[in-house]
From Swiss-Prot:
GO biological process: translation
Designated gene of the protein: rpmD
SUPFAM superfamilies, sorted: Ribosomal protein L30p/L7e
Subunit structure: Part of the 50S ribosomal subunit.
Keywords for the protein's UniProt record, in alphabetical order: Ribonucleoprotein, Ribosomal protein
Gene Ontology terms: cellular component: cytosolic large ribosomal subunit
Protein's name according to its UniProt entry: Large ribosomal subunit protein uL30
InterPro entries recorded: Ribo_uL30_ferredoxin-like_sf, Ribosomal_uL30_bac-type, Ribosomal_uL30_ferredoxin-like
Record-stated family: Belongs to the universal ribosomal protein uL30 family.
Domain of life from the UniProt record: Bacteria
Record GO terms (molecular function): structural constituent of ribosome
Record has Transport as a keyword: no
């Protein structure tokens, strides 16, 4: 079974760089406290590392 990650946006993207806003959007997050479930891949992990200060991540 493939590992999954539960990713929640816990801090606003207002005041962040355009690059960080684009990364959050590419993760599928738009609103504060919105949660998405993504596969645990190196690509997703890289995006999470770039904006880790805005996210809460849990392994499922």
């Amino acid at each position: 079974m493939e590992k999954k990650l539960k990713i929640t946006l816990v801090k606003s993207v207002i005041g962040q760089s355009e690059r960080q806003k684009a990364t959050v959007k590419s993760l599928g997050l738009r609103k504060l406290n919105q949660t998405v479930i993504k596969a645990d891949t190196p690509e997703i992990r890289g995006m999470i590392n770039k904006v880790s200060h805005l996210l809460k991540v849990e392994e499922i």
